[in-house]
From Swiss-Prot:
It is found in: Cell membrane. The gene is ecfA. Forms a stable energy-coupling factor (ECF) transporter complex composed of 2 membrane-embedded substrate-binding proteins (S component), 2 ATP-binding proteins (A component) and 2 transmembrane proteins (T component). This is Energy-coupling factor transporter ATP-binding protein EcfA. InterPro entries: AAA+_ATPase (IPR003593), ABC_transporter-like_ATP-bd (IPR003439), ABC_transporter-like_CS (IPR017871), ABC_transpr_CbiO/EcfA_su (IPR015856), Co_trans_ATP-bd (IPR005876), ECF_ABC_transporter_ATP-bd (IPR050095), P-loop_NTPase (IPR027417).
Length: 311
């Protein structure tokens, strides 16, 4: 659905931002692009609907090479919707209704179809009833949802969201991810960038790691988060579950890195057998208990014991 071939880009002031990126995303896939600040994630996204034109290389969307003619750009912007990092860059109308209607109106659709799309899109993001509110008076999470609705109203096949959960409380962030998972179930290809490792492991089927404008790795979240050295190089941290198991592994336990809390507990219980809590204490012995406390820190160690006791 998306293919980048040897894509390179430098900003007009000479700052190199992307160097020889090759990337393929299949139709309906959920992918995350991760990497430290300045790695080139936003620059890459701006190439996906022709806002930026590559200095070298090609952008291929749905089998067609973007050729940057006016007609082609209109077509591509219908197909690929981008939700910017800051919703204030996207929302500019006096009311939510007008903002969401802006795209479909520009497509020249009849009024009743525009109305239908506005209602449907606001419903999908849980913002029905906000039609007459002023976008600039909404909360950060609400603005984000209206910005997503504005893109949905264009009925895109690909949605690209630059850091969709940044600055949102955990519950609101989870709500945004649930919306994106639902869109993906409807067949939309969804690509996000994020620094939030918990969100990435919850959302993505495949992860691309960018660093200094280069693609340095790609794989499933598990493949990426198993590679502690890569994570360090990309200035990220491991998800909490992977971090815990990784530390146990370093302490000499035979565990594998898992990403979900459920899988982590299974891994721990598998390690410990039934009656986990008592066996843990017995199994650790004094020396290993000390090593474990040292590695995990006292607080985490007691949290682990407590969690196992609850099982
Ligand atoms: N308009 C611009 N003019 C000049 N340089 C720019 C411009 N926008 C971005 N850059 C530079 O291009 C590089 C890539 O920036 P980009 O915003 O794509 O990174 P990012 O991975 O999205 O970062 P972040 O996680 O901080 O959002 C950086 O070195 C940045 O300073």
């Amino acid at each position: 659905m998306i293919e980048l071939r040897d894509l390179s880009y430098s900003y007009p002031d000479g700052t190199p931002a992307l160097r020889g990126i090759n990337m393929k995303v299949e139709r309906g896939e959920r992918v995350a692009v991760i990497g430290p600040n300045g790695a080139g994630k936003s620059t890459l996204f701006l190439h996906l609907n022709g806002i930026l034109k590559p200095a070298a290389g090609e952008v291929i969307i749905d089998g067609e090479r973007v050729d940057y003619s006016k007609d082609e750009l209109i077509k591509i912007r219908q197909k690929v919707g981008i939700v910017f990092q800051n919703p204030d860059d996207q929302l500019f109308s006096p009311t939510v209704r007008e903002d969401v209607a802006f795209g479909p109106m520009n497509l020249g659709l009849p009024e009743d179809e525009v109305e239908e799309r506005v209602a449907e899109s606001l419903e999908k993001v849980g913002m029905s009833g906000y039609e007459n509110r002023a976008p600039h008076h909404l909360s950060g999470g609400e603005k984000k949802r209206v910005a997503i609705a504005g893109i949905l109203a264009m009925k895109p096949e690909i949605m690209v969201l630059d850091e969709p959960t940044t600055g949102l409380d955990p519950e609101t962030a989870d709500g945004i991810i649930r919306i994106l998972l639902e869109l993906s179930r409807e067949g939309i290809t969804v690509m996000i960038s994020s620094h939030d490792v918990e969100i990435i492991s919850q959302f993505a089927e495949r992860v691309f790691v960018l660093n200094s404008g280069e693609l340095i790795a790609e794989g499933t979240p598990l493949e990426i988060f198993r590679d502690a050295e890569l994570i360090r190089r990309a200035s990220l941290r491991l998800p909490r579950t992977a971090d815990l198991l990784n530390r146990l592994r370093m302490a000499g336990f035979e565990v594998d890195v898992k990403l979900t809390v459920e899988e982590t507990y299974h891994e721990l219980l598998h390690l410990l057998g039934g009656d986990a809590y008592h066996r843990l204490l017995h199994f650790l012995g004094e020396e290993k208990q000390h090593r474990l406390i040292h590695l995990l820190g006292e607080k985490k160690y007691h949290e682990l014991l407590h969690a196992l006791k609850e099982q």
